[in-house]
Amino acid sequence: MPQNASVIITQATAVITGSFLSGLMMGLSVVDIPVVLDTATQASQLLQHFTRLYDIGHKMMPSLAVTTCLLYGYTASSTRTTGGSGLPHIIAAVTTISMVPFTWLVMAPTNNALFRMHANPAAANLGEVRRLLVRWAQLHAVRSLFPLMGSVLGLRQILRE
């Protein structure tokens, strides 16, 4: 069903913001963490880097995910008012925001272990910190796939319409 320009622009914006979010997140796992693992020589340096990275990331990335979901929600609502199905857009939104429960359920133990070590860096073992950061980077790479899949689903719907 043909849609007006504002709905098409909103759909495209949702796909772009979701893709941007995914790329930003993936960059942390495949660029940032490997670089810091190659250059830091002390556990305290690694822990400081992680906590700063986490602080910046948790302020910015959830808001991008919510914004993307709101854009998909607007698109779903607009599509329904013109007689179309908003379900594909809702599925894209839910897929995108699924990164949040993944964080709470899967990543929290690793995050918490790193935060505990940061609270007492003198007692932190370099090998253990490195192992946890590698684990975090792997989990974070998986988490970055949620907004990417949401973008793929959103783009697929744009191409269908």
Swiss-Prot record:
It catalyses: emodin anthrone + O2 = emodin + H2O + H(+). Keywords: Glycoprotein, Membrane, Monooxygenase, Oxidoreductase, Transmembrane, Transmembrane helix. Its EC number is 1.10.3.-. It is a multi-pass membrane protein. Pathway: Secondary metabolite biosynthesis. The chain crosses the membrane at residues 15-35, 56-74, 87-107, 136-155. It is found in: Membrane. Induction: Expression is positively regulated by the transcription factors brlA and laeA. GO terms for molecular function: monooxygenase activity. Glycans are attached at residue 4. GO terms for biological process: secondary metabolite biosynthetic process. One of its GO terms (cellular component) is membrane. It is an enzyme of class 1 (oxidoreductase). It comes from the Eukaryota. InterPro entries: Anthrone_oxy (IPR013901). Specifically expressed in conidia. Belongs to the anthrone oxygenase family. Anthrone oxygenase; part of the gene cluster that mediates the biosynthesis of trypacidin, a mycotoxin with antiprotozoal activity and that plays a role in the infection process. The pathway begins with the synthesis of atrochrysone thioester by the polyketide synthase (PKS) tpcC. The atrochrysone carboxyl ACP thioesterase tpcB then breaks the thioester bond and releases the atrochrysone carboxylic acid from tpcC. The decarboxylase tpcK converts atrochrysone carboxylic acid to atrochrysone which is further reduced into emodin anthrone. This is Anthrone oxygenase tpcL.
